[in-house]
Amino acid sequence: IPQQSSTTPVRPAESINTKTEVFFMRELRNTKIIAVDHGYGNMKTANTVTPTGIKAYKTEPIFTGNILEYNGIYYRIGEGHKEFIPDKAMDEEYYLLTLMAIARELNVFSIREADVHLAAGLPLTWIRTQREAFRSYLLQNPEVHYLFNGKEYHLRFVGCSLYPQGYPAIVNQLGNFKGTNLLADIGNGTMNILYINNKKAQESRCWTEKLGVNQCMIAAKNAVLDKFGVKIEESTVEQILRFGTADISAPYLDCISSIARQYVAELFSTLRKYEYNPDLMRLYVVGGGGCLIRNFGTYDKSRVTIIDDICATAKGYESLAYMSLKRRG
């Protein structure tokens, strides 16, 4: 029997503006394909972004908002970020964050019950060794019942596709990749680096560096503490990193901006270590680190493309999984 797709509209990832439009969910034979980008800073789906902070409560929290109820325990999600760990399958909280992310994505379409095929990813150089363990981790419960923000969800997991982080964000743009290109996926915990030559990813030329945005965050907070003797809110530093400014006095802003410029300089220094030469190749940047390069970096804008859509990788996961499942028939 030939496989048929649902009537749910499907459009290429790059044509969607997440600020104004919904990225339509892929579906095959009544199975929802849901992508989750497990970041150290944020959990992303095709249409949602949630900070990875999570805190457990034995009783229902006083304040509402982003509350997951699972196995009799309440979890408030979205306050702060998680610490870096090299193997997410060793951290049970990422499973809870996955359930939350799926619920948020389903809620966009007012869906409460679904057969789900997950699409997710791992850092480029870790996927070979961690793929099967992470797949088993995500599929540990074939059927799950839970509540998120007071709404009940019933999921049946039917499969899971895993991809290298970063690359899926640009897979729909490969037609523009002529000659030598370098992809840098700068997340909260790591920077993944991949060469793409004549539209083909070079698996032998990929690296993962622990040089994520969180290192800049820590350095900025420490610099303020050392120079002024005060602690600064992480949310204030994050605003400066994202937008280049914040409503604080000039000395504090200058201090944090200086650290951000040093961090971006280190990013480019690391890329050069892997033979990055702006005269000979184009650089594509995905992930949250792109805004730091834009705000604090010195670079040739005609040779560097910063992909602003923080959900681009999740959309890519979803597209790749949909195409793969459709080919299987």
What are the language-model segments listed below?
Residues 2-183, 200-215, 227, 235-329:
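Nucleotide/phosphate-binding catalytic cleft detector across ATP-hydrolyzing
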Residues 45, 193-195:
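Conserved blade-register residue in beta-propeller folds
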Residues 186-192:
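Ser/Thr-glycine-rich phosphate-binding loops at phosphate-binding pockets of nucleotides
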Residues 223:
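A contiguous pocket-lining binding segment that forms or flanks enzyme active sites
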